[in-house]
Amino acid sequence: MAMNISNFFIKNIQKSIKFSRQYAKSTHPFTKTWSLINEEIKSGFKQQTDYPQHADVVIIGGGFIGSSVAYWLKTRAGEGLSVAVIEKDTAYEMSQNINSHGFITQHYSLPENIYLSQYSAEFLRNVKTHLNENVDIEYSPHGTLILASEKYAHKLEENVALQREYGVKNKILTGEEIQKMYPWLKTSDIKLGCISAESEGVFNAHNLLKGLILKSKELGTTYVKSEVIGFEMESQRDVLMEGVKPGSFNRINRLLYRTEDNEEISLRFAVCVVAAGTDSTHIAELANIGRGSDLLTVPLPVEKRTYNVYSIENEANKMSIGLNTPYIMDTSGLWLRRNGIQNNLICGLVPPLKVTDIPDSDIFHSSLHNRYPGCGESKIQTISTEYSDCNTYDDTGILGPHPYHTNMIFATGFSRQGVHHSPAIGKGVAELIIDCQYSTIDLSRFGFDRILIDEPLIEFNVY
């Protein structure tokens, strides 16, 4: 089903882009070697002196999704579209520790998520063609094993049947079969499992991020190390919009950002993409979303979730973790995967949708010792603390224009899926801006409207 986007949205996007054509010429050509750029990303961008005041599209957030949007916009439109990315953390400290994010799977119950995985897997396999020959994301294809208890076995079977309809090649296993394949796992409380081997695997997420940034800059995207502090609006009393009092509409057309020198600059734009991860709700509030009336009463329900990633060293127990060990998702929310060619595992818990009084470490250790009893003699240590942008409404990403600020497009709340789905999400946003509709994958159900009318879009998985 094709996405229905209002004529108001289409006309305003086209009109605004035409109006904003006169923009500052500020680009960052690809002139440094890969190693030098690598160090630049780690330490932050050089002091910026030329700050843009105009852009056709401004993207708030230069992480995986934001940089993917920039990449696809410039790939399709080239010099015909000016793109600026505002990122306050150009050292990407929030993205340095992303050990749990570098995986891709098709084990979903929503067709959109299956399609996002399939498209992104193809992008990752051909990343050197898309980005640069120097980009090495260390992609390692292997299967994902989903474990389901008696309670969730029926749901797993339903998911498997759906996935096969969309071309996913998978196989249902009994607990006994899983035990024979992976004797170090305890499966007495596992009813069924499902393993698949195509278009799934692990990769170096940080190298993917670097590659997206470098290519976006090479194509002409301007990255600005600054913090967004507000929006400017202009009254458009002639605009009539359902759910908005006549004569009260105010359109956002500028954002304010603060530079490293504490200078405040106003940037005029046609379209604003909010891909700010855990900061997205704050950005939305700056546009009065969640603080206004009528269509602005409902806030953006994206919150920060913090969780730990652990390493299990296996020298003590002599248990061999085979090289063919898949990425394992347990029914408890525990995940485990082999750490490259080393005989050890990295693991953690899927961040909960709702915060509870039970410490995550208690849940983790209980789940780990239940599924992997042999870890008792192993050294378990925390290797990183990571973050995700959790949509607390239904735990599914929010994508598309806001119903009031129709030139503000959200691309946030995807949690851990945001990394491996970022190539496809970025392409979808670029299609919205350039074509005013989704062309590759219909992602219209991910829109903000579902929150307004209280129709959650839930990914029914077994963990």
Residue ranges and their predicted role:
Residues 61-63, 67:
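Glycine-rich Rossmann-fold phosphate-binding loop(s) that bind the pyrophosphate
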Residues 71-72, 102-104, 126, 134-143, ...:
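Active-site substrate-recognition segment that forms the wall
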Residues 8-9, 30, 126, 148-226, ...:
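Flavin (FAD/FMN) cofactor-binding and adjacent substrate-gating region
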Residues 101-181, 333:
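Dinucleotide-binding Rossmann-like beta1-alpha1 core, especially the glycine-rich loop
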Residues 53-55, 261-271:
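Core beta-strand elements of the Rossmann-like FAD/NAD(P) dinucleotide-binding domain
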Residues 164, 176-180, 202, 303, ...:
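Flavin (FAD/FMN) cofactor-binding core of flavoprotein oxidoreductases
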